[in-house]
């Protein structure tokens, strides 16, 4: 499971000024060869209890950035995001002359992250069991060296490098959990990529008028992005739903919706790209 959230402005939110922030939360499955499920959920705040409520009953691993609200998901195993940590080190790399070949501490931190991503790229075609074994063999030593290096350095509090070190140490309990299962990812990029269509769209439509409109937007984005994630032609899939769903007694028999899901064999045959 991958989680992320982004800001959305809702003009007519009860007891809130129009310019205040509301949030669109995103939850999606991992890249483990199972059907892709990408769900958006509108909520009036960034309180981590929204994630707790949405994921009630889920057991397993979840990937997220360093937002503390996800700490409330205490019944699951949290996997940290090495892409976020790498970004922190990149932001801390100072400008220097092209003649200066010496590595800064921030560059060393970035290079550790790059080593891990390079190894991950070489493992992408393995089974989850093979990936699990290879990670322990190839990545565990890099991780041990990285944390020894982290413990050996200091930086000014509040500096860019200082912030990178604080992030690393705060996220340390979660940063190696992806090693526990070969199906887990080294980063939360899957969620960031899935939420990007919403953030791009937001630049055009700017806001939702009402909470009902924001929830409707969440439903539409969920349908469209899940269809895309399963390799369907979105226009054809929407036509398919509008044609067959009205004749389905899904209100009384919700199990009938399974035949309309993007991973249904009939749907994949009719609506494939």
Model-based region annotation:
Residues 1-273:
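Catalytic center-proximal scaffold of phosphoryl-transfer enzymes
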